[in-house]
Amino acid sequence: NSSADDGAIQVEDGDYLPNIPKHSFKLRTVYKPDPAWYLGATVTAFSSSYMMGNENQENDSSVNGLQSEVPGYAVVNLDAEYNFSSTLEGWKIYAKVSNLLDNKYYTGGRIAESRVNADRSFSEEEIATASLVGGAPRAGWVGLRYEF
């Protein structure tokens, strides 16, 4: 309970940094059907991480009901490019889609205190609360590039 110690949290060797996943994984593959084309796919995954405010990893959500970890997640991205070198020297067209599967995920979180209740009414006393930072939704774009 950090409030019992004037907000101080005792962190020891071996404790994990908040919002930094213990494990991460990235896999990229590229397919080139011919010299002008390339198609790529990337999968990026992160394990769960502890929220800020739980630096000593002692906040147990099973005891107080307050979420103490940011869940792990995975995202799939696709990209493609066509090089017009045979007809328009230096010009390329490209397309990208990030978060192809439109996963709902969180990139970070914080345990803090608030004076706003779940129903958005004001509270006379501070209430422990957890907030999460949402990840980017699916997005896509197309572009034209000239390289010289």
What feature does the model see in each segment?
Residues 20, 32-34, 71, 86, ...:
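Surface-exposed coil/turn segments at beta-strand junctions on protein surfaces, enriched
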Residues 49-67:
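A contiguous binding-surface segment within folded domains or other stable secondary-structure elements
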Residues 21-25, 72-76, 136-140:
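Residues that define the transmembrane beta-barrel architecture of outer-membrane proteins
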Residues 34-38, 73-77, 88-92, 139:
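Active-site lining segments that contact anionic ligands and/or coordinate catalytic metals
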Residues 10-16, 62-68, 127-132:
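Extracellular loop and loop/strand-boundary signature of outer-membrane beta-barrel proteins
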